[in-house]
Amino acid sequence: MHPTRFCSTRSLLTALIALFSAHAAPLSAQDSTQVASPSPAAPLDPRLAKLKAEALVMVESRAKQVQEIVDMLFSFQELGFQEFESQRYITTLLAKEGFSIEKGVAGIPSAWTAKWSYGTGKPEISLGSDVDGIPQASNKPGVGYRDPMVSGGPGHGEGHNAGQAVNIVAAIVVKQLMQRDKISGTLLLWPGIAEEQMAGKAFLVRAGIFKNTDVTLFTHVSNDLGVSWGASGSSALLSAEFRFRGSSAHAAGAPWRGQSALDAVMLMGQGWEFRREHLRLQQRSHYVIKDGGDQPNVVPSTASIWFYFREQDYPRTMALFEIGKKIAEGAAMMTDTKVDTIAILGSGWSAHFSKPIAQAMHANVQTVGMPKWDDKDQTLAKGIQKELNSPDFGLSEQVNKELRGAETPQNWMGGGSDDIGDIAWNVPTITLRFPSNIPGLPGHNWANAISMATPIAHKGALAGAKVQALTMLDIMLTPKVVADAWDYFRNVQTKDVKYTPFIRLQDTPPTYLNADIMAKYKSQLQKFYYDPTKFKTYLEQLGIEYPTVRAQVAQPKGNDGGGKQ
């Protein structure tokens, strides 16, 4: 923000400084209840309070930039390992802001890092968020029913188009304050590449991207604004492709001369189904046939099946993998084929998040609060909820006052995964959930794309950027936060657990994934790229009236403004 802007907002700054100065110190957690409770009030450092107040105003002044980044990445709609338009756009933006750019890191062509340092360069804060989309999730934003932009095309059905806006705007604001006030530190921005394939972050760790990092602040879209600490409740995951080799023959003329690799693949899948009954209820496992042969009249000489193995932790997940290898060998024996290769395509440890960093961030969540949704936002949310036969309670309006802690092992019942776990077991890490999506949706679905280039996404990302900026300032100016984070990391989190990567030295990023899908749809997707020089919003470019819902869920007009916190 230009210095003259501060003069016009002096009264707001004064009020914000008073608010921060009166705030309690970071909350202390009670391990026995897994809920953080307030500690006795302690005023913030006046300098930190002033900087935080300024940061809130500066982030708010960049609401337009948040909207443009969110909408631009939504319009690219790229799948994992093919995020090249996103790379070009983001790195160009950050280079103009003075960040040093490195592309193709960790052997991943679509990956990148952006770094900026001042003074001693310490502490180093890494800021990450995923960028990849979901196959067949194309849908027009702001439309509360199925209406693809590109039929069969990919889309942001996980909402990964919004998190980079949170990090970029927060980083630009904090960088300006660091320069002006001569605050030492390093900002390292990076994307979560191919998160849906769980195939990016472990390779970033192996490449040493975070070797100098003090704290990682990760962001992920949600329908609330919050953070948690301890065991995340996510599953560990190992992604592996089993490739079989046999010999071809005429499927009708001389089938007895062939050894069908496809038969082996099908037997492996069936064998896993029989074994599934005798596995823990908490495990999750799924597979698809990636290569089933070329045509029916040729006995397939090669075929492959791609598995996701999920369990509570590294040992249990590896045990599933070992079972899978035994079943593969059995399938090969039954079909007189061979297990040609077993490639680990990706992986993710079950995440464990830093309590001290979460405590600092939670206090900032309370300060920022949820966005002010208007009637149009709520109408869209209730419209898609009703469309999917979910409870139509609309958007959440309150943040959780309690800081939730570690999930107890006996209550763990399995679920999804996120490869942020590999980073979290190497450096103190938290994930900020920011409210750019709608509650009650299925996830990994076209419905989850509907809000992601609308005022809901813009307001949610702006709130996230405010929390992120405030937490970065806590880390920069309160050495105890970093010291406590590493004390927790060494003496609690990793006291009895040693990180061992799932990926082996011979495993490389499977950057070929999704190339064929993107090649198929690229020319159609390009027609929908956002042009912010011609249109204020992506909705305007698409000619979509916000919100568009089925008539029975439309509500009377009310306040259609607001959105500022």
Model-derived segments and spans:
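Acidic/His- and Gly-rich active-site-bordering loop/insert found
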Residues: 33, 37-156, 165-186
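Bacterial N-terminal signal peptides
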Residues: 11-23
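Metal-dependent amide/peptide-bond hydrolase catalytic core
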Residues: 262, 266-565
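Sec/Tat-exported extracytoplasmic proteins
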Residues: 55-66, 70, 74-77, 98, ...
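Histidine/acidic-residue-rich, glycine-tolerant segments that coordinate divalent metal ions
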Residues: 146-155, 161-162, 178-300, 310, ...
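Divalent metal-coordination and catalytic microenvironments
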Residues: 73, 94, 114, 127, ...
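Boundary at the C-terminal end of the N-terminal hydrophobic targeting segment
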Residues: 24-31
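N-terminal secretory signal peptides that target proteins for export/translocation
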Residues: 1-9
